[in-house]
Amino acid sequence: MQECMGSAGFEKREIVNIFDDPIFEGCVDGEIIEMARVRMTTIPEPTGCVPHKVVYSDIDYNGHCNSCRYLQTMTDAYLPDYYGKKVRLDINYSKEAMLGETLQTYYLIVPDGVQYQQKNGQGETSCSAKITIL
């Protein structure tokens, strides 16, 4: 079995560049663009808000909302027109959402894309994201 990313990143729980792994040789289409990290901020005055109740099909085997579903519910709330364009997605998972919880998806349309923030019933941020059109 091939060892992925040298396991050093996993043992130390550090950020690693996955494209340094030999498994990705020949898989990257075009150049890799180095980008600075994006700081997630609270949305002071959202453009809109859409509720989503976490249902059975949203949860994973741990009983938490599946990580892909956060992004799906965000883009269901508002999807920027980025078809055929390069985009950058920054996402920050803060607190797990559980079966039966209702998440409020706040979104803010910004000049270069859209910023999202999902909050649970206690007002805690579960997930935040930004889609930037490059």
What are these regions (language model features)?
Residues M1-T42, A97-G100, L108-L134:
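HotDog/MaoC-like acyl-thioester-processing domains
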Residues G9-V87:
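Hot-dog-fold acyl-thioester-processing enzymes
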Residues D90:
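Short aromatic/hydrophobic contact patches that present stacked aromatics
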